[in-house]
Amino acid sequence: MENLKNINPIKVDKTTIINLEKGKLPPQALDLEEAVLGAMMIDKKGVDEVIDILQPDAFYKDAHKHIFEAIFQLFTDSQPIDLLTVSAQLKKNGKLELAGGDFYLIQLTQKISSSAHIEFHSRIILQKFIQRSLIKISSEIIEESYDESTDVFDLLDKAESKLYEVTQGNIKRSSETAQSL
């Protein structure tokens, strides 16, 4: 199991290790993550369509989380969002290299020509995040279920609470987005 931690450059948790041992990767859509981030840097309209749907944790790749955080900070501060401002914000945050550097940002903007379908793509990213969240919660519940000292009713409450958090967070974002349309 120690060897698996060294193989995957993406942050590894118990759920990821379990899935890798079973030959499964966690649900993800890296190509769509790249397309959404690239579109957000080339078209302001794309930012407006996505900013209420996604959060940094929705991205599977850590570099993408950092890039989205920088875009979100620029958006919150009412600053222009483009390749140069995102790069500058990442530098300011000390995360440019963690995000893949300037070359990676350029690659993201070159992979996409418009923000067409960005909302649809961001909803797929959100669905993959929800799937990963459910897998993580389920794995934690399974692990705790084997612990004889765990009170079963406390475990049920904990499971219900965690599932409710996933549901509420995503229903809220979906309804806010629907109202803005």
What are these regions (language model features)?
Residues M1-I130:
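Noncatalytic partner-interaction/assembly domains of nucleic-acid and motor enzyme complexes
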Residues Q110-L181:
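Interdomain "pre-motor" coupling segment immediately N-terminal to P-loop NTPase/helicase cores
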